[in-house]
């Protein structure tokens, strides 16, 4: 039977523990709330990583926060040239989370890094749904030059009411996502992804005999590989990623409306401070020839590559653009957009387009368009 002295000691011990732990818990909670209040995804992730890593044992913390190995491109090329054979130099990064500043940590988790897991594998693991291309709903899109009679060299001219009677104003929506299907492949720690993008043009303001038809829908599945790399670029830039993939794009229609093409592409991811640049080059592949090809001249208008640019104005405002140009034909396109916060995770977007190829059915038709709509936070893509 415990004595009165033993009971007193137990109570004193509980009191000491409570008085010591409660302030710690309060401080920890306040710090976590400060992280939650951050609107910028990059800075918020860095804040959470820093405070929660501090609660782990030293060995677990170091293991969990160790940065992902990257291919040192400069040393790989230099060593391969010196030895006369292929030499892969993979650089194991140090601590990915500096303990002194969330701002310094945020410099590591850039939008490009988060999009493609260049510095750290995402906790959602394989097969998780991730952002890919911009995902938006534009209730109002105005096109100054509708394509009333779309055509191609092998399919002739399409004469249908949904094209001939279309209005200049319509609704545009795009859904896009990607999922990692394999990670840390080969000695270079590459990742394999599946992506899907679907864009629709809806004649919602056209209340004719065919009430509010979908004028066109493009489907674009793709599979691609990304490789984290490290190399310096002029003017303080950094080469962060190399990649390659295969993409199929079609509108799912029968002749004469059918449009489709397949491409193999190579890409790179580069950063200059708040500016992210992703150039791509492509070639047509596995397409049918002759009269079996829906659009044999599509490369004349869509070119052989594009350049994506994104610039972070501040925590929640971005501008981005996509540029295409074929120097041989002089045809191309420019897309530009501005995203801004509305409330919570909801963003607004203003988007403009000039040139050829706003959709597959319009690949050889020049037009100008502008629209305004909504975009969910984290789904503005790059």
From Swiss-Prot:
One of its GO terms (biological process) is lipid catabolic process. Its cofactor is Ca(2+). Gene3D superfamilies: Phospholipase A1. It is an enzyme of class 3 (hydrolase). The keyword Metal-binding applies. The chain crosses the membrane at residues 66-78, 169-183, 190-202, 214-233, 237-250, 260-272, 275-284, 307-313, 316-325, 333-341, 347-356, 366-377. Ca(2+) 1 binds at residue 211. Binds 1 Ca(2+) ion per monomer. In the dimeric form the Ca(2+) is bound by different amino acids with binding of each Ca(2+) shared with ligands coming from each monomer. The Ca(2+) ion may have a role in catalysis. It is found in: Cell outer membrane. It catalyses: a 1,2-diacyl-sn-glycero-3-phosphocholine + H2O = a 2-acyl-sn-glycero-3-phosphocholine + a fatty acid + H(+); a 1,2-diacyl-sn-glycero-3-phosphocholine + H2O = a 1-acyl-sn-glycero-3-phosphocholine + a fatty acid + H(+). GO terms for cellular component: cell outer membrane. Ca(2+) 3 binds at residue 294. Residues 1-27 form the signal peptide. It is a multi-pass membrane protein. This is Putative phospholipase A1. Belongs to the phospholipase A1 family. CDD domains: OMPLA. GO terms for molecular function: metal ion binding; phospholipase A1 activity; phospholipase A2 activity.
């Amino acid at each position: 039977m415990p004595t009165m002295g033993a009971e007193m000691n137990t109570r004193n011990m509980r009191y000491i523990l409570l008085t010591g732990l409660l302030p710690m818990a309060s401080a920890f909670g306040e710090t976590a709330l400060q992280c939650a209040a951050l609107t910028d995804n990059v800075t918020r992730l860095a804040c959470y990583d820093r405070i929660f890593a501090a609660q782990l044992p030293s060995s677990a913390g170091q293991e969990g926060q160790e940065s992902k190995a990257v291919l040192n491109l400069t040393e790989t090329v230099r060593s391969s040239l010196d030895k006369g054979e292929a030499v892969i130099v993979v650089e194991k990064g140090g601590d990915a989370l500096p303990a002194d500043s969330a701002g310094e940590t945020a410099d590591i988790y850039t939008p490009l890094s988060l999009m493609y897991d260049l510095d750290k594998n995402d906790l959602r693991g394989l097969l998780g749904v991730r952002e890919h291309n911009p995902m938006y709903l534009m209730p109002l899109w105005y096109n100054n030059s509708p394509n009333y009679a779309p055509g191609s060299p092998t399919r002739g001219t399409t004469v249908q009411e949904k094209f001939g009677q279309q209005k200049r104003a319509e609704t545009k929506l795009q859904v896009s996502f990607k999922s990692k299907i394999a990670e840390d492949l080969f000695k270079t720690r590459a990742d394999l992804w599946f992506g899907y993008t679907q864009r629709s043009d809806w004649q919602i303001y056209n209340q004719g005999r065919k009430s509010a038809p979908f004028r066109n829908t493009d489907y674009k599945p793709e599979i691609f590989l990304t490789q984290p790399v490290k190399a310096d670029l002029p003017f303080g830039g950094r080469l962060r990623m190399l990649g390659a993939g295969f993409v199929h794009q079609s509108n799912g229609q029968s002749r004469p409306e059918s449009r489709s093409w397949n491409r193999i592409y190579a890409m790179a991811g580069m950063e200059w401070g708040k500016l992210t640049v992703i150039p791509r080059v492509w070639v047509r592949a596995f397409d049918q020839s002759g009269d079996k090809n829906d659009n044999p001249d599509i490369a004349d208008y869509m070119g052989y590559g594009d350049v994506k640019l994104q610039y972070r104005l501040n925590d929640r405002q971005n501008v981005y653009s996509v540029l295409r140009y074929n120097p041989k034909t002089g045809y191309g396109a420019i897309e530009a957009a501005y995203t801004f916060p509305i409330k919570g995770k909801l963003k607004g977007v203003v988007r403009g387009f000039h040139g050829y190829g706003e959709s597959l059915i319009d690949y050889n038709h020049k037009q100008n368009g502008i629209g305004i709509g909504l975009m969910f936070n984290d789904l503005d893509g790059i």
